[in-house]
């Protein structure tokens, strides 16, 4: 019997399961209540389980004896535990979701009452009906499994065929997921807001969510990013540009970025761009990810209300879900009830974008929020999204990042070549290639690729809406960046007026866009159009825009009016400032919302500048002007309701004046607008704007000083208002900046012109309260400027006055004072020099002797002069030039001061004696010494008075002292009255600015008090004591006199500073002194009575202890029990201890601290002692300049004279107050010249500063760093290209070795074929045996045109023959012709047009260079040795490694001349050895192979042999996709082939490292030699090789990137050059999964899934476009079937490889339309690698069948049929060497053809070939090989793409006019012929050969590149069912017939079973057996081959005419332009 271990065992399982459940709860925020309920239910379940399996125990401690063995009991117990645990685990798994849902549903009801705004307005969606998915019955169409699907009572499950719709089968519920996501993984978590919402949420709710809940500002630009969902990598340079440009565009414009939100594809790239921004919260870019809720990984963790969810952004590649990108700030998780399905967010995102685009940027503007789409990479859904954007109303501009891949590259290319009209000639000519590219790029089928092609065309119909961004390195300057491209695209797409564009640019703050796109040449702006923009730029502090507007015609003088300036002061934009704080000081009771007036601003300026300054806004003149202007501008500039409230309060009092004052528009303007704007910028703390205004306008030096003073005063106010310390420091730094600029400007001006610089300092400033720069510098405490030599020269000049003495000046002045007659001996300045000195107005007028005329020039009333003089500043300077009391008009006397008059006076006019005395006594130095002498005499007299006994009546010494001090008091009163401010308090504050003045006043008042006591008998002694005390100050006042001295002045300043600092120290000392003094006094004298003497007793002894007096007896007085001694007080022993501590602290610590402070003060002042003294000197000069002439006490006479003068002026009605400040009065013209000099100095100063900045170390380091980064990038590119070049060379060498082995076997087969043909061909002596026909390895056609003189005439050409004038018959390899009489001529390659844009010729992508150098050849020599043959084949094989070769055969037109055009088929490869990576492989053609001959019967003239040229192989050879696809073919290859494939794979890994953009080059002609021809030889001989130097083609290194656009352009621009395949990861993706790494397999799995998601979005967008009119509908985009069948999708590649499958039988088929099957291979009509035949094709079907594999191993394809063993791999012709033709029309070629053709002409869209088609052609046929330009060398060994091989046909063409036959020789591309047509081809070829004797024969050999079926339809009439004989009968007979005997011999000697070997490749598995080939050729596998038919009547005419052009250009030794020579 088995018992449980414990009756509590079931609870163990409960605890264990509950622990697991707690883990789930931790991530799902499930409360403990749910856990408790779950534990309870689980406990009940366990109890039931336990009851079923276990017996009930009697007691907890009782155990039933065990009757079974111990081991059995243990096993049963474990089995029981396992059963219970598994059962409970199942319960947990099944019920945890229901518990979470129950909690989520009940939580809002319990804890969120009422619900939040988000829950009220946003909903989620849940599927309520189970509809089985067609692919999986256990899953619903919504994506949920059946076991977890919600079931609603009353709703039955649907059937598998039902259509699931989110609107019908889901129900909305309040959202249960919103809050904050904290992305973990970094140093600090990145937070993002999220919300789950329904797919049909209204966009206005979303905008409210952004603005109200998430506190976002509305965007000024919306950038919606579209791209691929699958992960992709951007090229490094492009990635850097995209990241930088996107971030800059978003941050500078305040844009929002919309993305997909998930961490895949393009959203991941955007997230990486946002990563550069950093973690800052403020100013973070608003990036909003809109993702489907159902695809979010672990979305159950997001459930909760306003939660903070920790999240790790780590995705699982095997999961179909995705994680959110951790760089986004906001997420909208769109829910439509589906799980793991994309597409839910598309409709919502588009509706939201459309809604935002309709929002206004500003409340009062008409411009809406611009939206732009940025396309990066992308899939099929991206193309459809772009289509939806550009066709929407209003359309959305699209910016495409070219080079990012896939959809973006295709859009960029199609956009580039799209035309505005309906016709798209270039794109239509490339239609098939584009469709193929789409198939490969998106891995879709043909139907869908054609649909995507049409959508691309529809996108480009709105070409102006699409802008392509591509990195371009322009030598002339910087390329346009992505942010500029985005903003420019908006201007291009939205047809906005220039003001609207300027407003947008201002909103974005992008002055570069405004400069490049708006202010362009030719843009005219009406008057005032830019004023609003200027106002907006000033308000928003847009410095660059203000500068730009000033540059483009905005006149600030006309712009700035009084209302606008007041509006600027009241703007809410811009930085925070302290203007409001200061304004509350001048206007204490300001209501809320008060609008500042200019009068208020004037009061603030006056407060900040000090009493010396009066703002123009506070002048009486300004008040009526302000009132009149504001009344006039009230309706225009202000709202009437607010304007009436904020009007200036004094305007009503001036209503009469305002009404009478005439209003003019000029009244509202300012004379110096930049000055007003400078003050506005300073007061509102806009430093950069202030600096801009400082650089503009006049009076720059004065503006810098005013700004410095304002900033310092504002800093002082900020410190007093206890504002942040940062504000104080910021304002101080701004003040220092202006202080420095002013000083440097003065220094620069002084170096330019010292005299004018001095004038700048002393001239009167009308705009700044009539002050001078010197007085402003003193007010700003600008010591450096006053210490400048320019200022010191002025001060020295002012100090000396009219004197001019150099030595012993003081002695001479004292001597002059003592002996007045000595004054005549002193030197004085001339009258001219005196007039140029600064002076007061009074002196100026007196010097002009104009006082007697003052009555005639009384000042008019203010009202009469308002309109003219309102801008004249009448304020006078204060103490440093301040004396005036009231306003005055300075214009009345300024007209009398004309410097030009004084220039006419003699330069050295001496002064009169009277003037000398006046100048001597009024000089400041004279006044100083007179005052000093008088003061010293006063001190002597006053000292005598206090030292001797004071009598009842004062002595004369005392009377003198009384008189001196009394008159000094009157002088101080005069100084107060003469100060500028009107208010007495302001006057006193100005006077008290100098600290000696208040001290003088206190001493005088004290003396007067003592004097009052002195004259009373009983208090005379008190008066005497006051005298004695007062004498202390009068002695100390000597320091003021000593301050003038250069050495003593700084020391006096130090003393003053030390006294200030000592006051703080005294406070500390008093604290320590009182603490110990009170303690000592209280202990020693406990019984003291309260008296005032206690204060003295407390402080007396401790204070004097500081100076060494210890008072030892008092510290510890003797005491004891001895009666002679006083008793000891309690605690008497404490006193010595405390006093010892006191002396330690006070005497040592505090005194030394004071010494250290004084030492610090000395060091500070001593370092600037020179500046301090110079600054003090200015104060002394100004003080003595304004003093009266006589010193006290004689100064009373001067006071009496001034009073009398004042009364006289007042009686006469004259203005008595004059400005006594020292200034220079200049005429207006002189002032303008001075301002011009100052402006020039400002410009020179900035230029000098710029030079200094560029030469500074920091700037040089910065420039060096940028250059090093650029060089590093280029070196990295060079290194990368060098590595790839090295890998390419190694790969080529490996392939060449393999080709050598293959060539040996090929040559052995050739020898067998040659012997066989020699045996079976009659007339061997007449026919020349040749190796020109290399069977099977050359995709060429050879036509033999035989004139009637050479052979007999015959009937018309067969149906296999070409055209109405001749027949084209296939010529067998063994056909016997009399070729000895044919001349072999070399072909000459002509140069391309200089205007042609094409890739680098001769250069592989990896950098390997090849060059084709033709050499003379001997065609009759025979290759006698195997080694020679091997060498030829090696050269021939190496030629195949080239990318392509353009071969052109210039032929002259001769009717009866035999010409043989021959090209050397073999080339030898010579690789230059050396260490350089730029070594090139030189390809030297090896002669003596009659391959690709064009034979024409005629005369054997040797002079008709032009040169032969080869176009060297060019273009990129081995791209990533090119080599990667080779892996698929390697499975069936032999060991040799596998080695080659391995080389490809190894190369792929290196080739994928670099991508390059094609450069623009042009080929150069070679100087080729004529090839001599030897006749009579039956076998070709061994050619002689002539080494020729290779051309030096420079390797151009590119730092650009490549894209699909490059590859498409290569097709569009190349001359039959191959198209490099698209780069892809096929090499890694097509490998078996066992060979992949784990990361590769995961990436493959993820990419596959994400591409399916792109297709799903593509289908949803289709519904969106169809329902364009109802975009606001709820879910039209979702009304799509759930299951989408992708079975029709084709793989990415177009597979046309050939697989040898002898076991598979082939099926015979009839000939179909040639246009349809010309390019068919293996039954696939889209196959572009198939080979066709020109003329009647002879198909061979040796049991081989086409397989849909892509051929890429063309270069080694000669091994395919050489080996008879089955192990020999099959090769297929590659698109690499035989690409489709380029789709580009050339206008010149078209015109040249039209000149020589009839009207019935139809030209093909082929870029270089225009075939004229006759209107009467009926039954002609021609194969698909019609292209003139061949992409590969004609004589290269290669196989077809099809089972049938390249045909060698004979085309018999008979001239239709005049009986002369004209022959054209050109390589012709052949269409692919399938093996299924073998039988039919043999019949056609035999019939063609039978009719060959009736006409001239033209032999052509051409390769077999792919052909476009669509173009064949357009160019040829296709004959599908008529027999070929009808075409031959329709050919008219010409009198000159060809040799019929030879032609019949060709047809009769050729046996029917052997026809396949004559027309096609005879390299079969056994070349000796003809019976095998007969059997195998009877098989066919292509049932749908059609041969197009064309008439050659007009074709030959046009070809003949064009060939004459070629001939003429060839004879003139000039290569003809390509565009004019294409046939």
Curated annotation (Swiss-Prot):
Changing residue 1900 to R: In RNA edited version. GO terms for biological process: intracellular zinc ion homeostasis; magnesium ion homeostasis; metal ion transport; monoatomic cation transmembrane transport; protein tetramerization. InterPro entries: Ion_trans_dom (IPR005821), TRPM (IPR050927), TRPM_SLOG (IPR041491), TRPM_tetra (IPR032415), TRPM_tetra_sf (IPR037162). Residues 1-653, 949-992, 1046-1057, 1158-2023 are cytoplasmic. Changing residue 1860 to A: In RNA edited version. It is a multi-pass membrane protein. Keywords: Ion channel, Ion transport, Membrane, Phosphoprotein, Transmembrane, Transmembrane helix, Transport. This is Transient receptor potential cation channel trpm. It comes from Drosophila melanogaster. The lineage of its organism: Eukaryota, Metazoa, Ecdysozoa, Arthropoda, Hexapoda.
């Amino acid at each position: 019997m088995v018992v449980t271990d414990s009756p509590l065992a079931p609870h163990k399982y409960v605890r264990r399961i509950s622990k697991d459940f707690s883990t789930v709860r931790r991530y799902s925020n499930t409360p403990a209540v749910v856990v408790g309920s779950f534990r309870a239910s689980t406990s009940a379940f366990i109890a039931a389980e336990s009851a079923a399996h276990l017996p009930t125990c009697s007691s907890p401690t009782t155990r039933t004896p065990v009757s079974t063995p111990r081991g059995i009991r243990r096993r049963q117990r474990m089995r029981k535990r396992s059963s219970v645990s598994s059962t409970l685990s199942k319960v947990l798994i099944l019920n945890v979701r229901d518990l979470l849902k129950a909690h989520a549903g009940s939580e809002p009801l319990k804890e969120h009452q009422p619900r939040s705004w988000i829950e009220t307005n946003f909903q989620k969606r849940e599927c309520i009906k189970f509809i089985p998915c067609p692919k999986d019955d256990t899953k619903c169409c919504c994506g949920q499994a059946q076991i977890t699907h919600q079931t609603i009572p009353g709703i039955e499950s649907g059937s598998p065929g039902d259509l699931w719709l989110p609107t019908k089968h889901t129900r909305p519920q309040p959202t249960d997921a919103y809050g904050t996501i904290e992305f973990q993984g970094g140093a600090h978590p990145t937070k993002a807001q999220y919300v789950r919402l329904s797919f049909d949420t209204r966009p206005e709710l979303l905008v409210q969510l952004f603005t109200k809940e998430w506190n976002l500002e509305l965007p000024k630009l919306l950038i919606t990013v579209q791209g691929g969902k699958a992960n992709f990598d951007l090229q490094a340079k492009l990635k850097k540009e995209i990241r930088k440009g996107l971030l800059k565009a978003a941050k500078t414009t305040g844009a929002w970025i919309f993305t997909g939100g998930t961490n895949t594809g393009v959203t991941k790239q955007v997230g990486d761009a946002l990563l550069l921004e950093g973690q800052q919260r403020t100013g973070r870019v608003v990036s909003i990810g809109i993702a489907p809720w159902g695809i979010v990984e672990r979305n159950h963790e997001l459930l909760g209300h306003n939660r903070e969810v920790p999240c790790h952004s780590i995705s699982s590649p095997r999961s179909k879900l995705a994680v959110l990108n951790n760089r986004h700030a906001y997420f909208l998780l769109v829910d439509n009830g589906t799980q793991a399905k994309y597409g839910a967010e598309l409709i919502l995102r588009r509706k939201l974008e459309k809604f935002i685009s309709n929002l206004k940027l500003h409340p009062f503007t008409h411009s809406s929020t611009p939206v732009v789409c940025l396309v990066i990479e992308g899939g099929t859904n991206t193309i459809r999204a772009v289509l939806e954007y550009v066709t929407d109303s209003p359309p959305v501009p699209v910016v495409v990042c070219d080079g990012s891949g896939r959809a973006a590259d295709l859009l960029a290319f199609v956009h580039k070549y799209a035309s505005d009209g309906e016709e798209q000639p270039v794109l239509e000519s490339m239609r098939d290639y584009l469709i193929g590219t789409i198939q490969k790029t998106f891995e879709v089928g043909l139907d869908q690729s054609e649909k995507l092609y049409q959508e691309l065309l529809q996108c480009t119909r709105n070409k102006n809406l699409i802008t392509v961004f591509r990195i371009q390195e322009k030598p002339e300057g910087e390329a346009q960046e992505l942010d500029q491209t985005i903003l420019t695209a908006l201007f291009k797409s939205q047809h906005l007026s220039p003001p609207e564009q300027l407003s947008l640019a201002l909103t974005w703050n992008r002055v570069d866009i405004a400069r490049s796109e708006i202010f362009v040449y030719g843009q005219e702006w009406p008057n005032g159009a830019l004023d609003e923009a200027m106002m907006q730029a000033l308000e928003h502090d847009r410095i660059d825009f203000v500068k730009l507007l000033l540059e483009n015609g905005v006149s600030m003088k006309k712009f700035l009016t009084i209302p606008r300036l007041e509006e600027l002061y009241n703007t809410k934009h811009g930085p925070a400032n302290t203007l409001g704080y200061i304004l509350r000081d001048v206007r204490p009771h300001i209501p809320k919302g008060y609008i500042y007036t200019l009068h208020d601003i004037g009061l603030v300026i006056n407060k900040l500048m000090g009493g010396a300054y009066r703002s123009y806004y506070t002048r009486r003149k300004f008040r009526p002007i302000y009132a009149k202007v504001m009344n006039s501008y009230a309706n225009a500039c202000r709202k009437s309701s607010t304007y009436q409230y904020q009007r200036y309060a004094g305007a009503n009092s001036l209503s009469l004046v305002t009404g009478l004052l005439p209003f003019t528009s000029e009244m509202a303007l300012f004379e110096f607008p930049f000055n007003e704007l400078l003050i506005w910028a300073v007061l509102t703390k806009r430093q950069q704007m202030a600096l801009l205004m400082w650089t503009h306008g006049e009076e720059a030096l004065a503006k810098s000083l005013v700004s410095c003073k304002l900033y310092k005063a504002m800093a002082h106010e900020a410190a007093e208002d206890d504002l942040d310390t940062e504000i104080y420091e910021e304002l101080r730094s701004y003040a220092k900046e202006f202080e420095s600029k002013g000083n440097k400007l003065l220094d620069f001006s002084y170096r330019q012109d010292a005299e004018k610089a001095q004038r700048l300092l002393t001239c009167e400033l009308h705009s700044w309260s009539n002050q001078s720069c010197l007085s402003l510098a003193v007010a700003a405490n600008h010591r450096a400027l006053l210490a400048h030599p320019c200022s010191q020269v002025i001060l020295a000049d002012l100090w000396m006055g009219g004197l001019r003495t150099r030595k012993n000046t003081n002695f001479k002045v004292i001597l002059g004072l003592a002996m007045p007659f000595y004054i005549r001996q002193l030197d004085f300045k001339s009258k001219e020099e005196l007039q140029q000195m600064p002076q007061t107005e009074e002196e100026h007028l007196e010097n002009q002797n104009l006082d007697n005329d003052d009555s005639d020039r009384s000042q008019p009333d203010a009202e009469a002069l308002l309109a003219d003089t309102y801008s004249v500043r009448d304020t006078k300077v204060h103490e440093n030039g301040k004396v005036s009391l009231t306003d005055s008009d300075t214009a009345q006397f300024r007209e009398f001061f004309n410097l030009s008059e004084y220039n006419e006076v003699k330069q050295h006019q001496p002064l009169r004696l009277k003037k000398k005395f006046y100048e001597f006594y009024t000089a400041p130095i004279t006044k100083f010494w007179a005052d000093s002498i008088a003061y010293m005499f006063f001190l002597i007299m006053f000292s005598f008075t206090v030292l001797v006994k004071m009598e009842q009546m004062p002595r004369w010494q005392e009377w003198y002292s009384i008189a001196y001090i009394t008159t000094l008091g009157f002088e101080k009163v005069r100084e107060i009255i003469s100060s500028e401010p009107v208010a007495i308090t302001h006057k006193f504050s100005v006077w008290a600015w100098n600290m000696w003045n208040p001290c003088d006043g206190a001493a005088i008042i004290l003396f007067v008090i003592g004097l009052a006591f002195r004259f009373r008998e009983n208090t005379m002694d008190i008066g005497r004591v006051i005298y004695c005390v007062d004498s202390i100050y009068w002695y100390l006042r000597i320091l003021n006199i000593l301050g003038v001295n250069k050495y003593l002045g700084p020391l006096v300043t130090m003393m003053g500073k030390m006294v200030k600092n000592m006051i703080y120290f005294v406070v500390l000392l008093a604290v320590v002194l009182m603490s110990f003094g009170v303690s000592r006094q209280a202990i020693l004298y406990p019984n003291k009575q309260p008296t005032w003497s206690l204060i003295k007793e407390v402080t007396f002894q401790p204070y004097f202890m500081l100076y060494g007096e210890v008072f030892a007896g008092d510290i510890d007085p003797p005491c004891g029990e001895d009666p002679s001694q006083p008793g000891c007080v309690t605690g008497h022993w404490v006193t010595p201890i405390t006093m010892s501590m006191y002396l330690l602290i006070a005497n040592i610590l505090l005194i030394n601290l004071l010494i250290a402070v004084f030492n610090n003060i000395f060091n500070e002042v001593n370092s600037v002692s020179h500046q301090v003294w110079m600054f003090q000197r200015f104060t002394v000069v100004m003080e003595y300049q304004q003093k009266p002439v006589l010193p006290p006490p004689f100064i009373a006479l001067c006071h009496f004279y001034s009073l009398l003068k004042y009364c006289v002026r007042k009686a006469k009605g004259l203005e008595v107050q004059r400005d006594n400040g020292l200034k220079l009065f200049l005429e207006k013209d002189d002032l303008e010249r001075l301002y011009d000099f100052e402006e020039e100095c400002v410009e020179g100063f900035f230029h000098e500063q710029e030079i200094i900045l560029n030469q500074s170390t920091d700037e040089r380091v910065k420039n060096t760093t940028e250059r090093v980064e650029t060089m590093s990038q280029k070196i990295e590119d060079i290194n990368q290209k060098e590595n790839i070049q090295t890998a390419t060379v190694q790969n080529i060498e490996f392939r060449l070795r393999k080709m050598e082995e293959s060539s040996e076997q090929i040559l052995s087969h050739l020898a067998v074929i040659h012997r066989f043909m020699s045996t079976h061909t009659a007339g061997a002596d007449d026919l020349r045996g040749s190796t020109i026909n290399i069977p099977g390895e050359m995709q060429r056609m050879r036509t033999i045109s035989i004139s009637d003189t050479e052979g007999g005439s015959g009937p018309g050409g067969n149906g296999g023959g070409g055209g109405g004038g001749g027949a084209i018959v296939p010529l067998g390899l063994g056909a016997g012709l009399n070729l000895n009489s044919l001349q072999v001529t070399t072909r000459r390659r002509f140069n391309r047009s200089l205007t042609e844009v094409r890739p680098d010729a001769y250069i592989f992508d990896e950098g390997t260079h090849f060059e084709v150098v033709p050499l003379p050849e001997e065609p009759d020599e025979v290759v006698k040795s195997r080694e020679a043959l091997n060498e030829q084949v090696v050269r021939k094989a190496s030629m195949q490694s080239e990318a392509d070769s353009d071969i052109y055969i210039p032929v002259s037109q001769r009717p009866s001349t035999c010409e043989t055009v021959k090209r050397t088929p073999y080339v030898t490869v010579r690789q230059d050895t050396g260490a350089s990576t730029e070594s090139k492989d030189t390809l030297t053609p090896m002669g003596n192979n009659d391959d690709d001959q064009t034979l024409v019967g005629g005369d054997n003239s040797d002079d008709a042999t032009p040169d032969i040229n080869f176009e060297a192989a060019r273009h990129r050879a081995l791209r990533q996709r090119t080599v990667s696809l080779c892996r698929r073919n390697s499975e069936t290859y032999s060991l040799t082939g596998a080695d080659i494939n391995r080389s490809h794979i190894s190369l792929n890994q290196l080739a994928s490292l670099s991508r390059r953009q094609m450069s623009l080059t042009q080929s150069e002609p070679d100087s080729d030699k004529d090839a001599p021809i030897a006749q009579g030889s039956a076998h070709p001989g061994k050619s002689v090789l002539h080494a020729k130097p290779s051309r030096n083609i420079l390797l151009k290194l590119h730092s650009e990137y490549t894209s699909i656009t490059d590859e498409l352009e290569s097709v569009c621009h190349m001359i039959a050059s191959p198209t490099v395949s698209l780069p892809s990861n096929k090499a890694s993706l097509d490998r078996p999964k066992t060979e992949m790494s784990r990361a590769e397999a995961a990436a493959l799995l993820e990419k596959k899934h994400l591409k399916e998601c792109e297709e799903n979005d593509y289908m949803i967008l289709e519904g969106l476009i169809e329902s364009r009119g109802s975009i606001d509908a709820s879910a039209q985009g979702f009304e799509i079937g759930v299951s989408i069948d992708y079975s029709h999708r084709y793989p990415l590649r177009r597979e046309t490889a050939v697989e040898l499958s002898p076991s598979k039988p082939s099926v015979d088929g009839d000939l179909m339309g040639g246009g349809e099957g010309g390019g068919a291979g293996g039954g696939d009509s889209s196959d572009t690698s198939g080979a066709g035949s020109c003329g009647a094709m002879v198909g061979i079907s040796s049991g081989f069948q086409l397989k849909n594999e892509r051929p890429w191993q063309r270069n080694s394809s000669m091994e395919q049929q050489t080996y008879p063993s089955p192990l020999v791999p099959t090769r297929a012709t590659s698109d690499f060497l035989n690409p489709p033709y380029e789709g580009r029309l050339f206008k010149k070629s078209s015109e040249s053809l039209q000149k020589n053709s009839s009207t019935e002409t139809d030209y093909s869209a082929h870029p270089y070939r225009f075939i004229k088609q006759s209107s009467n052609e009926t039954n002609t046929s021609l194969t698909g090989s019609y292209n003139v330009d061949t992409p590969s060398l004609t004589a290269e060994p290669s196989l077809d793409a099809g089972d049938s091989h390249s045909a060698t046909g004979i085309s018999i063409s008979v001239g239709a006019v005049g009986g002369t036959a004209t022959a054209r020789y050109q390589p012709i591309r052949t269409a692919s012929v399938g093996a299924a047509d073998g039988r039919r081809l043999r019949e056609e070829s035999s019939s063609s050969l039978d009719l060959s004797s009736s006409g001239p024969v033209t032999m052509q050999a051409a390769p077999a590149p792919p052909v476009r079926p669509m173009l064949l339809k357009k160019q040829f009439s296709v004959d599908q069912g008529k027999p070929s004989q009808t075409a031959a009968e329709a050919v008219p007979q010409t009198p000159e017939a060809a040799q019929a005997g030879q032609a019949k011999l060709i047809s009769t000697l050729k046996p029917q079973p052997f026809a396949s070997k004559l027309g096609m490749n005879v390299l079969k598995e056994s070349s000796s057996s003809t019976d095998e080939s007969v059997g195998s050729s009877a098989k066919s596998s292509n049932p749908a081959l059609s041969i197009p038919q064309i008439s050659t009547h007009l074709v030959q005419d046009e070809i003949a005419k064009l060939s004459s052009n070629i001939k003429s250009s060839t004879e003139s030794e000039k290569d003809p332009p390509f565009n004019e020579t294409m046939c």
